[in-house]
Amino acid sequence: MSSGKIAQVVGPVVDVVFASGDKLPEINNALIVYKNGDKSQKVVLEVALELGDGLVRTIAMESTDGLTRGLEVLDTGRAISVPVGKDTLGRVFNVLGDAIDLEEPFAEDAERQPIHKKAPSFDELSTSSEILETGIKVIDLLAPYLKGGKVGLFGGAGVGKTVLIQELIHNIAQEHGGISVFTGVGERTREGNDLYWEMKESGVIEKTAMVFGQMNEPPGARMRVALTGLTIAEYFRDVEGQDVLLFIDNIFRFTQAGSEVSALLGRMPSAVGYQPTLATEMGQLQERITSTKKGSVTSIQAIYVPADDYTDPAPATAFAHLDSTTNLERKLTQMGIYPAVDPLASSSRALTPEIVGDEHYEVATEVQRVLQRYRELQDIIAILGMDELSDEEKTLVGRARRIQFFLSQNFNVAETFTGQPGSYVPVEETVRGFKEILDGKHDQIPEDAFRMVGGIEDVIAKAEKMNY
């Protein structure tokens, strides 16, 4: 194990000099330095650049407070490695794979894997396009998720991103026996803590590994924590042959962290001050999220859009990798429609006859057409009232409102708050229900019977209770 000495500390960037003749650490190797020689105060550095004359530039994964020039630095000879396997489920980790949930620390001999890996090769990739059934009607019908696909989850504060994430984790665990990995990138510590306890109460945590690089941590940790979560997910895909769900919140903060260290590493800034390596860094992360012949990693990524500017390089670079988008709309929460997924703004590459089948595709496009026409008629209704519409338009509005309410449903993870049992609706049942509404089979049932229910049978049962 070769050793060097700290030559310079500039915020999260630390220069380390190695004696001439010593073997220099490789790029992405982990180095260890102890503050004041105290073994309990370890700081991990990751090699980013080799500057020549035995000098390497590194990024700190922890605070550099207390580091001084001249401190000894040890080369571990390998990249940052994190625990993998079934023992990670139900646990919370930081970027280095250290357990931070106050439970038993991981054994020293636990299996670990490096966070830096190559993306699967072409011959390992799965060529089939298979839908991942979520049991959530609005997603399965209008913006279905592909196994091994990437989903962008857009939404402001308080519109239900967290509950939607929890329900997806619950449904994958209950219906598919699947594993989920939640990665908080630049998360507020309070939000991460709330999510952990909510998931513990709902029983979802047993099928979930959680990794956090909080907002108060150095940019090095926030930049690498997504790779830590992805490494845990990849193990379940490649070794256990599982279909894994990987949540990243927020992918923008991954880019932001890279931008923070880029200038300190001596790189010229690119457009809007972002790092010139933005597309490469994003590609290295996103290309590892895919389906192989053994299993799949499906990622759901929350994406913050700065100043609602979709041309900003950070979200624009992420968009290039997405297969589906799920847009949450505040107006729908005000109408009491949950999940508040906008059926017209959300989209999916999987919504084609070749992947979902002809019937599903036709029903989905007709639902979108009816909702779009209803949106166009709303101005007329608001100004002149329903009486000014033709009989055909009145029928369309009635069906559109029933569709809008039928896109809502109770969630299993929200049962403790709502007092209503959650529902998991298979895709076939979802398609059949909406087809019957479009065909006018339920025009006589009151609109309220369609609100917050599961399948179409639940609507009929609810209507009978209402004595329509």
From Swiss-Prot:
Catalytic activity: ATP + H2O + 4 H(+)(in) = ADP + phosphate + 5 H(+)(out)
The keyword Nucleotide-binding is annotated on this UniProt entry: yes
EC number: 7.1.2.2
CDD domains per the UniProt record, alphabetical: ATP-synt_F1_beta_C (cd18110), ATP-synt_F1_beta_N (cd18115), F1-ATPase_beta_CD (cd01133)
PANTHER family documented for this protein: ATP SYNTHASE, ATP SYNTHASE SUBUNIT BETA, MITOCHONDRIAL
Family: Belongs to the ATPase alpha/beta chains family.
Name the UniProt record assigns to this protein: ATP synthase subunit beta
Species assigned in the record: Streptococcus agalactiae serotype V (strain ATCC BAA-611 / 2603 V/R)
